[in-house]
């Protein structure tokens, strides 16, 4: 009966209109404050279907990356809860992660945020048997600063200087697809970032290296880019810039501009239910 309820919930989640997910239902299991980094530093929350999955059926997994300008934010923010819950309702294991923020260490923290998020992918692969996931089917989604990080995970590889130095043998950080919610594509055209440890004028190279658009000419994992026209924090032109660079490179991507949507929306902004779009994209590349 519980499995039937899960199947019905998953099917219902694909159809609009549906009441916004604001609380975690009993059909979703959440494990909080899981250690995934060396030492007792950043932690993660795991969302998964509560219904038992047959041993032969491995779940796809998605890393969720919070925003906050690389200065603040948390894995347990409302947007991340909404995304994690909706993913679990649709048959995914979702891992909402924290990463090093500006001010937590002396000087610059970059590229620490990228490395932490890539280590989350490594942790999923290392623990795939215990988690019941397919290590070949891992995606990523993030909003704002998290969107920037999601795009970097999709676009960068071993030669780009973002790989953790302590990678286990036979384990890599590649993701199969990424969803970038209103992320910064070109840091040089945005504003100075505390995480970089210098201004754009003083060290333009670090800003260029931290910009997803820098890597758009490479072979990339498929990207879904979402941005609202009412965003006053990150100009929608940032997403258009990344989409154009990906188009010019012949990379698989989709740009969706949502009229009237502000910054920090989740999968269910009042302007449009984005679950069919986002879940459909993930299903195509991870199932």
How would you name each of these model-derived features?
Residues 20-26, 39, 159, 167, ...:
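Mobile cap/lid helix-loop segments that gate and shape the active-site cleft of serine hydrolases
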Residues 219, 225-227, 231:
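Short beta-strand/loop motif that positions the catalytic acidic residue
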Residues 52-59, 65-106, 148, 188:
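Short substrate-entry loop that stabilizes the transition state in hydrolases
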Residues 45, 107, 236-287:
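C-terminal catalytic histidine-bearing segment of alpha/beta-hydrolase fold enzymes
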Residues 119-192:
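Primarily recognizes the serine-hydrolase "nucleophile elbow" in alpha/beta-hydrolase
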Residues 16-56:
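N-terminal cap/lid segment of alpha/beta-hydrolase-fold proteins
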Residues 186-187, 230-234, 264:
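Acidic catalytic loop of the alpha/beta-hydrolase fold
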Residues 35-36, 74-83, 95-135, 268-273:
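Catalytic nucleophile-loop/oxyanion-hole region of alpha/beta-hydrolase
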């Amino acid at each position: 009966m519980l499995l039937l309820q899960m199947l019905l919930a998953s099917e219902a989640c694909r159809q609009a209109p549906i009441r916004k997910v604001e609380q975690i239902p009993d059909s979703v299991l959440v494990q909080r404050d899981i250690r995934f980094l060396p030492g007792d530093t950043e932690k993660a929350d795991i969302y998964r279907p509560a219904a038992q999955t047959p041993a032969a059926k491995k779940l796809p997994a998605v890393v969720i990356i919070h925003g906050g300008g690389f200065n603040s934010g948390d894995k347990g923010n409302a947007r991340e809860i909404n995304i994690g819950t909706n993913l679990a309702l649709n048959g995914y294991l979702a891992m909402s992660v924290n990463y090093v923020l500006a001010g937590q260490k002396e000087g610059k923290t970059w590229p620490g945020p990228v490395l932490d998020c890539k280590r989350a992918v490594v942790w999923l692969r290392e623990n795939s048997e215990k988690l019941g996931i397919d290590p070949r089917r891992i995606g990523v989604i993030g909003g704002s600063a998290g969107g920037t990080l999601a795009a970097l995970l999709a676009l960068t590889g071993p030669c780009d200087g973002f790989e953790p130095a302590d990678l286990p043998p036979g384990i890599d950080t590649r993701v199969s697809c990424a969803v970038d919610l209103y992320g910064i594509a070109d840091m040089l055209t945005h504003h100075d970032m505390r995480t970089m440890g210098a201004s754009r004028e003083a060290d333009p190279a670090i800003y260029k290296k931290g910009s997803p658009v820098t890597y758009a000419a490479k072979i990339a994992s498929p990207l879904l880019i979402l941005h609202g026209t009412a965003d006053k924090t990150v100009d929608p032109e940032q997403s258009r810039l990344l989409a154009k660079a990906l188009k010019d490179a012949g990379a698989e991507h989709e740009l969706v501009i949502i009229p009237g949507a502000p910054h920090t929306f989740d999968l269910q902004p009042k302007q449009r239910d984005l679950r069919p779009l986002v879940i459909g994209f993930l299903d195509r590349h991870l199932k």
